Swiss-Prot record:
The gene is pyrB. InterPro entries: Asp/Orn_carbamoyltranf_P-bd, Asp/Orn_carbamoylTrfase, Asp/Orn_carbamoylTrfase_sf, Asp_carbamoyltransf, Asp_carbamoyltransf_Asp/Orn-bd. Keywords: Pyrimidine biosynthesis, Transferase. Catalyzes the condensation of carbamoyl phosphate and aspartate to form carbamoyl aspartate and inorganic phosphate, the committed step in the de novo pyrimidine nucleotide biosynthesis pathway. This is Aspartate carbamoyltransferase catalytic subunit. Heterododecamer (2C3:3R2) of six catalytic PyrB chains organized as two trimers (C3), and six regulatory PyrI chains organized as three dimers (R2).
Length: 337
């Protein structure tokens, strides 16, 4: 896993402590993470209304900058922005000027000239959203939609929302994160968020070849045995094998991985009877999770997707609000770029 890329609380927060950018869960105050969850709770029912919109970002422009493909994540960000009444621009990186030699910085400057208010950034390189946040003008918010192996903070927060929804809080909870921890930006963000929110214990379970050397330094207990790692946990979060990021030598075979670390009903018996099962998606059935579990009564995977829209609405609205208040405090007029 990648080390901290910047003093993240200073980059992400306004002088008054409001959200300015959302780049990582690391080092953020507990009160802010709880504010995100509380704000998301107010948006959950929007999807069930006849008119699925609130006017909080009316007149704002959100640009999705996805340098790494992800239909699911981009779609939920797009839907979240639309439900906030924002205008949304999806930049096709493969056909954009960046693929023709224009630098990332030049692309940003051109988008800023179009009066963009927010960039949602997904990039294959760790740290790219930090770079963008440091380069944009003060009235543009940046949301990290996943960067390299480093962080995926909105995924972590929708997972935190799901846990709080089903468990009522975090105190006393034992949470197991299972699978390809080494390549998972989601796992890193989850560990930070769980520790900040007061979980009793965070466990990382996987083969030694797929566990980062700094796992315990993150504030997690490491297990290589599923029976020991799942014993009496309240939440099981399964992660997919990121074969596109790994050397084949790290994994004997998918069948062997499933035998040892795939979650089926037999292995789930080691967890508490009321333990919930989560997965950030996409799911590889028969590799990290059996269909009997993914589709079973303890699975809350589909609800994670539903909650994800509300959480991203919360983050986007809070970041824009923080930017606007920061500009007002500085005496600047929003729109001067």
């Amino acid at each position: 896993m990648t080390p901290t890329l910047a003093p993240s609380s200073r980059v992400q927060l306004t002088d008054s402590g409001k959200l300015r950018h959302f780049l990582t869960t690391e080092h953020l105050p507990r009160s802010l993470l709880e504010d995100i969850l509380d704000t998301a709770a107010s948006f959950v029912d929007v999807g069930g209304r006849a008119i699925k919109k609130v006017p909080l970002l009316r007149g704002k422009t959100v640009v999705n900058l996805f340098f790494e493909s992800s239909t699911r994540t981009r779609s939920t960000f797009e839907l979240a922005a639309q439900r906030l009444s924002a205008d949304v621009l999806n930049l096709d990186i493969a056909k954009s000027a960046t693929s023709k030699g224009e630098t990332l910085l030049d692309t940003l400057r051109n988008l800023e000239a179009m009066a963009a208010d927010m960039f949602v950034v997904r990039h294959q390189d760790s740290g790219a959203p930090f770079f963008i946040a440091n380069e944009v003008t003060p009235n543009v918010a940046v949301i990290n939609a996943g960067d390299g192996r480093h962080a995926h903070p909105t995924q972590a927060m929708l997972d935190m929302y799901t846990i709080r929804h089903y468990k009522g809080g975090f105190e006393g909870l034992k949470v197991a994160i299972v699978g390809d921890i080494l390549h998972s930006r989601v796992a890193r963000s989850q560990v930070h968020a769980l520790n900040i929110l007061g979980a009793d214990e965070v466990r990382l379970i996987g083969p030694k070849t797929l566990l980062p050397v700094d796992a315990e330094a993150l504030g997690a207990t490491v297990f290589t045995d599923m029976a020991q790692g799942l014993k009496d946990v309240d939440v099981v979060i399964m992660l997919r094998l990121q074969k596109e990021r790994m050397d084949s030598a790290l994994l004997p075979s998918e069948a062997e991985f499933f035998r040892l670390y795939g979650l089926n009903n037999d292995k789930l018996l080691f967890a508490k009877e009321d333990a919930i099962v989560m997965h950030p998606g996409p799911i590889n059935r028969g590799v990290e999770i059996a269909s009997e579990v993914a589709d079973g009564p303890r699975s809350v995977i589909l609800n994670q997707v539903t909650f994800g829209i509300a959480v991203r609405m919360a983050v986007m609205s809070m970041a824009i609000s923080g930017q606007d208040s920061d500009m007002s405090a500085a005496g600047g007029a929003h729109g001067q770029r």
